[in-house]
């Protein structure tokens, strides 16, 4: 399971039965946009198999000391940052859900979300990813042309 956007603070997939979990550490875990790293965690049986085939020798499984330092720096503020992300995202969701211009909002805190019950059961909070539908393509273009916080970028979140 890719847990990049949830982090271990919002979801702990191994406790929920996942066999392998991956995290893009360059996003929430680092939090400053100045490192490229990731990691995986797995059940012992799977980790033993990975060690046996020496997968780390092929994939370069060691993070450098500078990257490790930068990730640890980010982890110190992860809870505070995620608290703010979750609270602010819920405000955006509430605004969008109340807008006459928005047809549908997709966010797990909403009871009409298809996976709402699963999210309530498995997540401590609902994270910072939300999507929504406008009434038409033209309306969507108008929003994208007038929202200054969103930009096309090579890296998600930076």
What are these regions (language model features)?
Residues 1-101, 106, 117:
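Conserved PLP-enzyme active-site core in the AAT-like
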Residues 101-158:
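Conserved C-terminal alpha-helix-loop-beta "cap" of PLP-dependent enzymes
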């Amino acid at each position: 399971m890719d847990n990049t956007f949830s982090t271990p603070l919002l979801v702990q997939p191994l406790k929920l039965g996942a066999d392998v979990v991956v995290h893009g550490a360059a996003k929430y875990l680092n939090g400053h946009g100045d490192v490229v790293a990731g990691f995986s965690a797995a059940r012992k049986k799977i980790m033993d198999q990975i060690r046996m085939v020496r997968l780390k020798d092929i994939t370069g499984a060691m993070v450098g000391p500078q990257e490790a330092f930068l990730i640890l720096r980010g982890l110190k503020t992860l809870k505070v940052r995620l608290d703010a992300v979750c609270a602010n995202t819920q405000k955006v969701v509430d605004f969008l859900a109340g807008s006459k211009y928005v047809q549908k909002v997709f966010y797990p805190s909403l009871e009409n979300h298809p996976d709402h019950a699963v999210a309530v059961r498995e997540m401590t909070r609902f994270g910072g990813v939300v999507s929504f539908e406008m009434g038409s393509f033209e309306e969507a273009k108008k929003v994208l042309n007038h929202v200054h916080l969103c930009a096309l970028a090579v890296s998600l979140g930076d």
